[in-house]
């Protein structure tokens, strides 16, 4: 029986262990095997045949439960429309395997590791199973260092750890995906780093936008595909829950190869981790498990841990993971975001209030929690500047109610100065993105950490008190703000 060579790393499959479908419940199948030939949990099985309309079918599924009486329950990785009872199911004898290595860069894959970009087959030469153990404790690297992103608000107030796990928390439409796209762009251009993007249950349009954006910015080089810096793995909203549940593991497996074999520092982007949880919840219900808190699966902690514990730094290389986390109804106590919190080194919370003001990226400094913002890690100058910025913004927040009642004129001179500087800081935290040039009309800017610290120190010290606050909006470094102020003065 011919099967997909990219899914399993073999060109033909010997029918050693053949079962047949006994029941189909949406994306979940019950399969009977001969006595003594039960497949293992997580083994992949192939269903090939013709549907009632005479069309060829090729469905891969993964064993999830052993039911007894020589039956297993499996979850399909693609649509089950057209499958019928009594169809033959061939056990491959191994978990799902996907292509890994340089051949994956610049290409788009589905959960099975099949290329879906119409650019031909992938000559990877090597495949890896998507189910693996986390690196041994002795292999872990505990060294702390900052990962510069070129985004002012992130680098100053919520710095990322190299080899850490970072969560982007926010409701719908506050800019999580745009921030991820900018990070991929900056990391590829400034660091020459390799990235793997896992699109887990997000909109197909967003996946297409990301691909087009990566081509425009030359992160994916269509003319010379080997020079590309990112591999894309998609399991979008229209896919069955099995694919959405496993596509994160496919992306992670590709990233692990760059870390373990090529000994590189890799970036792994997952958008969106909540869709991974939701897919697990759908599968859990179909497998007959009793729901837990708020209807989520009882195995939520285990499923999250099996993904997150593999994302780590070793002495050979690192995986720095940035995960978008959709927060249902903006409720951070929901079990899905709450379970994710436990695994993260830093959280970047995106605020609807800031987005409404037009401050992009809409990162909320008061809600974001960086574990790396310690003087012995980032240095005294960075730490003190960040603390002073936070204190100024916090004081501004406290004064807003008083100003709303009495007006700014009734405030003390000191409070008026604090408000003026805080408003400049708030605007200076905005930044034009390379990937959002179409929307903002401003060319994107990469700002180094040194320039970022210098700019905020100048605002805090009062050197720029005479400049209008609008000069600080959507600029890169502080020199641009002063130039913008000078230009507007001439125009007026």
UniProtKB/Swiss-Prot annotation:
GO molecular function, one term: ATP binding
Gene3D superfamilies cross-referenced by the UniProt entry: 2.40.10.170, Bovine Mitochondrial F1-atpase, Atp Synthase Beta Chain, Chain D, domain 3 (1.10.1140.10), P-loop containing nucleotide triphosphate hydrolases (3.40.50.300)
Localization (cell): Plastid, Chloroplast thylakoid membrane
Keywords for the protein's UniProt record, in alphabetical order: ATP synthesis, ATP-binding, CF(1), Chloroplast, Hydrogen ion transport, Ion transport, Membrane, Nucleotide-binding, Plastid, Thylakoid, Translocase, Transport
UniProt topology in membrane: Peripheral membrane protein
Record CDD domains: ATP-synt_F1_beta_C (cd18110), ATP-synt_F1_beta_N (cd18115), F1-ATPase_beta_CD (cd01133)
Broad class of the protein's primary localization: plastid
Catalytic reaction list: ATP + H2O + 4 H(+)(in) = ADP + phosphate + 5 H(+)(out)
An annotated GO cellular component: mitochondrion
A matching Pfam family: ATP-synt_ab
Domain of life: Eukaryota
GO annotation, biological process: proton motive force-driven mitochondrial ATP synthesis
Presence of keyword Zinc-finger: no
EC numbers, comma separated: 7.1.2.2
Positions of ATP binding: 170-177
Top-level enzyme category: translocase
Record NCBIfam families: atpD
Quaternary structure (record): F-type ATPases have 2 components, CF(1) - the catalytic core - and CF(0) - the membrane proton channel. CF(1) has five subunits: alpha(3), beta(3), gamma(1), delta(1), epsilon(1). CF(0) has four main subunits: a(1), b(1), b'(1) and c(9-12).
Protein's job: Produces ATP from ADP in the presence of a proton gradient across the membrane. The catalytic sites are hosted primarily by the beta subunits.
Family per similarity comment: Belongs to the ATPase alpha/beta chains family.
HAMAP family: ATP_synth_beta_bact
Name the UniProt record assigns to this protein: ATP synthase subunit beta, chloroplastic
Source organism: Huperzia lucidula (Shining clubmoss)
């Amino acid at each position: 029986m011919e099967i997909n060579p990219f899914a399993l790393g073999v060109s033909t499959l010997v029918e050693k262990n053949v079962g047949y479908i006994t029941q189909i419940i949406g994306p979940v199948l019950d399969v009977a095997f001969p006595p003594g030939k039960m497949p293992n949990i997580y083994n992949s099985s192939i269903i090939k045949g013709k549907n009632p309309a005479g069309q060829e079918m090729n469905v891969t599924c993964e064993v999830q439960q052993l039911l007894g009486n020589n039956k297993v329950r499996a979850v399909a990785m693609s649509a089950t429309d057209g499958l019928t009872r009594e169809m033959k199911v061939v056990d491959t004898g191994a978990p799902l395997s996907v292509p890994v290595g340089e051949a994956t860069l610049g290409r788009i894959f589905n959960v099975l590791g099949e290329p879906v970009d119409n650019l031909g087959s992938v000559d990877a030469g090597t495949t890896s199973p998507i189910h693996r153990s986390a690196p041994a404790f002795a292999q872990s690297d505990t060294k702390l260092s900052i990962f510069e992103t070129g985004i002012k608000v992130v680098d100053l107030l919520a710095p990322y750890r190299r080899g850490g796990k970072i969560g982007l928390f926010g409701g719908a439409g506050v800019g999580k995906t745009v921030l991820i796209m900018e990070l991929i762009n900056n990391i590829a251009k400034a660091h020459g780093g390799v990235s793997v993007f896992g699109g887990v249950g997000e909109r197909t349009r967003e996946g297409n936008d990301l691909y087009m954006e990566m081509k425009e910015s030359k992160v994916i080089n269509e003319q010379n595909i080997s020079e590309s810096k990112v591999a894309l793995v998609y399991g979008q909203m229209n896919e069955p829950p099995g694919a959405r549940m496993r596509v994160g593991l496919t992306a992670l497996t590709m990233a692990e190869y760059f870390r373990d074999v090529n000994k590189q520092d890799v970036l792994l982007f997952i958008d969106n981790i909540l869709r991974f949880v939701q897919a697990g919840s759908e599968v859990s219900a179909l497998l007959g498990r009793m729901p837990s808190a708020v209807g989520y699966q009882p195995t939520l902690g285990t499923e999250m841990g099996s993904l997150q514990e593999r994302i780590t730094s070793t002495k050979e290389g690192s995986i720095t993971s940035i995960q978008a986390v959709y927060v249902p109804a903006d409720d951070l106590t929901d079990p899905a975001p709450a379970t994710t919190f436990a695994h993260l080194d830093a959280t970047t919370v995106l605020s609807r209030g800031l987005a409404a003001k037009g401050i992009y990226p809409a990162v909320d400094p008061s809600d974001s929690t960086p574990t790396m913002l310690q003087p012995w890690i980032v240095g005294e100058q960075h730490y003190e500047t960040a603390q002073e910025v936070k204190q100024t913004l916090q004081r501004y927040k406290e004064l807003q109610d008083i100003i709303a009642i009495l007006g700014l004129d009734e405030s003390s001179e000191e409070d008026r100065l604090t408000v003026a500087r805080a408003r400049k800081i708030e605007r200076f935290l905005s930044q034009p993105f390379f990937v959002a040039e179409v929307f903002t009309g401003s060319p994107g800017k990469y700002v180094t950490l040194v320039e970022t610290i210098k700019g905020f120190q100048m605002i805090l010290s009062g050197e720029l008190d005479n400049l209008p606050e609008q000069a600080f909006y959507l600029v890169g470094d502080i020199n641009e703000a002063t130039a913008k102020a000078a230009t507007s003065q001439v125009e007026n």
